Amino acid sequence: MASLSLAPVNIFKAGADEERAETARLSSFIGAIAIGDLVKSTLGPKGMDKILLSSGRDASLMVTNDGATILKNIGVDNPAAKVLVDMSRVQDDEVGDGTTSVTVLAAELLREAESLIAKKIHPQTIIAGWREATKAAREALLSSAVDHGSDEVKFWQDLMNIAGTTLSSKLLTHHKDHFTKLAVEAVLRLKGSGNLEAIHVIKKLGGSLADSYLDEGFLLDKKIGVNQPKRIENAKILIANTGMDTDKIKIFGSRVRVDSTAKVAEIEHAEKEKMKEKVERILKHGINCFINRQLIYNYPEQLFGAAGVMAIEHADFAGVERLALVTGGEIASTFDHPELVKLGSCKLIEEVMIGEDKLIHFSGVALGEACTIVLRGATQQILDEAERSLHDALCVLAQTVKDPRTVYGGGCSEMLMAHAVTMLASRTPGKEAVAMESFAKALRMLPTIIADNAGYDSADLVAQLRAAHSEGRITAGLDMKEGSIGDMAVLGITESFQVKRQVLLSAAEAAEVILRVDNIIKAAPRKRVPDHHPC
């Protein structure tokens, strides 16, 4: 019987696109490697910055070297690149730092996988080798971790070193000591709770970064109303989200026709009485400070002033939420049952000047660990980048307070893990050993890139570092000030164990997900149907 020759059958809708086998894999590798190459120049203490310009009517300018910020603000179309962008975002949310490292490591793993597949090694063999390598690297990292949680002095020094290491690759590196102290003091005030919501960051143009300071209280970037007390002691605070602008008819957009101006005056009087009644209900709570998320119009403001109550309007939602947290109050919208409303409290509310701006200062708040970091700087871009840098440091410190284990930075941990994986590969038979060796090579690329970004001879430095670890000097790492190999324990270049562990596991998982892909199917775009029913 003659064999049937079938033409290829397209099972997808018109407009759908499919990439298969090698084409799909190559497309994934190229996209992921391109993302890694984009951010790798920002890695390390001598990393470079990127300028991000957004288009459109409200075009904004951003100068940053934060991996997560760069990847979040660029639009990517490649599916593998999107996987790495999402991974860096998760790294930022989980531990706050290591966003560039995790992206670069995943990209380097895929670069190695590309050359292994070219040598006809099956993706599943590579994955099996990588899984064993990840396990060995994690165990090596765990065995090198140091825990000073029980020693207060050493733990404080660890926190200072970790904050310093995190900030050394940021814009704040020139004021590292100042901001390290600020960040550590702010996190230690949390008393182990790790609730970063209690740390409020305010940015004010003017002065220099060195003028930034930590304020032991809460600052709200608003002004106190006219003819109202500017200072209140032992404050009882009602925090609300309610309309205080009932000076116009707002009943389902209704219209009112009147036959004389006297009728208009009657309507206005009724509106005023309605507002007066609402203010009286608020005052029944026994408060001396009223903070509203929405506007407070002139008439209710006068009523509050006459009652000797400080009224603060238009406190943005994030400000109100945080204020409720630190003063121990709850946000209210109705005022019929004063006994059910939880009021906030603080010892003193007063108006203060920062630069040319007036702010409201709350001191002696119910949440004792609450504080505000006031950032000063010459331009808005500097302030924004300083805030991002400080956020990374605060997140890492909060993570370290929960899990006090630390490891050494400067490429030391990566080289330690690479050495453990290489030793495992030498004991493993078959093709999996080649995959393990490629994993070790990808880990060694991180110190290589750090040295390259600093303008040093990376091949020579990494060879020296590899030799040092082979000789058993497990605290050896890159000293980027001197351009040589140094002892990280002496130099105080310390990183959080959780950050390093998350970088290793996230990068390995993301690279494995992309390596498993052998088909990319793009759905057909939705057809636009002409609208035959215009408004």
UniProtKB/Swiss-Prot annotation:
Residue numbers carrying N-acetylalanine: A2
GO cellular component: cell body; chaperonin-containing T-complex; microtubule; zona pellucida receptor complex
Family: Belongs to the TCP-1 chaperonin family.
Organism, scientific name: Rattus norvegicus
The enzyme's E.C. designation: 3.6.1.-
Binding of ADP, residues: G44, G98, T99, T100, S101, S168, S169, G410, E495, K500
Name of the protein in question: T-complex protein 1 subunit beta
GO BP annotations, alphabetical order: binding of sperm to zona pellucida; chaperone mediated protein folding independent of cofactor; chaperone-mediated protein complex assembly; chaperone-mediated protein folding; positive regulation of telomerase RNA localization to Cajal body; positive regulation of telomere maintenance via telomerase; protein folding; protein stabilization
Subcellular location: Cytoplasm
Chain positions recorded as ATP binding sites: G44, G98, T99, T100, E495, K500
Phosphothreonine: residues bearing it: T261
The encoding gene: Cct2
